[in-house]
């Protein structure tokens, strides 16, 4: 193994362990409320990045459903709230509608499969901040996943016309 591979692997392991260490300390960060009946409180802990302003977090809330060949989606809005007295953001997905799908005829013999169907709507892209957890309150039957987006180093220039 090359020196870079060893360092990259060690760095990833350290970031993962750091994230796990943070994961047990939500109550130490701030008094986020417990989830109400019918909801779960799901938490995302982010590793520290060198230039966090170049990153965004896409929150992927959804359900694993049995679907055919059509494109499926759920509907909803992720609302940002503030933890009173602290000013820390948290997010609430109040209700989820659907599923909705395209209505194309599937080719004969196409099997149904179980896939993660995301909620599509407003508010699902949030600022990257490794100093605070991303706390999401979602209905019990909704799973929360996330994806990290990063800005390209290449910056284009607009042309006056």
From Swiss-Prot:
Disulphide connectivity of cysteines: 69-106
Residues at the site labelled Reactive bond: 103-104
GO molecular function terms attached to this record: serine-type endopeptidase inhibitor activity
UniProt keyword terms in alphabetical order: Disulfide bond, Periplasm, Protease inhibitor, Serine protease inhibitor, Signal
Gene Ontology cellular component list: periplasmic space
UniProt-annotated location(s): Periplasm
One family name in Pfam for this protein: Ecotin
Keyword Disulfide bond: yes
Signal peptide annotation: 1-23
Subunit structure: Homodimer.
Role played: General inhibitor of family S1 serine proteases.
Entry protein name: Ecotin
């Amino acid at each position: 193994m090359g020196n870079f591979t060893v360092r990259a692997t060690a760095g990833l392991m350290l970031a993962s362990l750091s994230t796990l260490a943070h994961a047990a300390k939500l109550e130490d960060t701030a008094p986020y409320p417990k989830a109400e009946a019918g909801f779960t409180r799901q938490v995302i802990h982010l590793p520290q990045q060198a230039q966090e302003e170049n990153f965004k977090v896409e929150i992927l809330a959804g359900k694993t459903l049995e679907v055919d060949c059509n494109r499926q989606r759920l509907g909803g809005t992720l609302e940002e709230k503030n933890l009173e007295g602290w000013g820390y953001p948290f997010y609430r997905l109040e209700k989820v509608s659907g599923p909705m799908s395209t209505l194309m005829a599937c080719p004969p013999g196409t099997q149904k499969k179980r896939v993660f169907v995301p909620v599509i709507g407003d508010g699902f892209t949030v600022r990257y901040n490794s100093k605070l957890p991303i706390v999401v309150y979602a209905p019990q039957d909704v799973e929360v996943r996330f994806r990290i987006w990063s800005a390209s180093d290449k910056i284009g220039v607009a042309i006056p016309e």
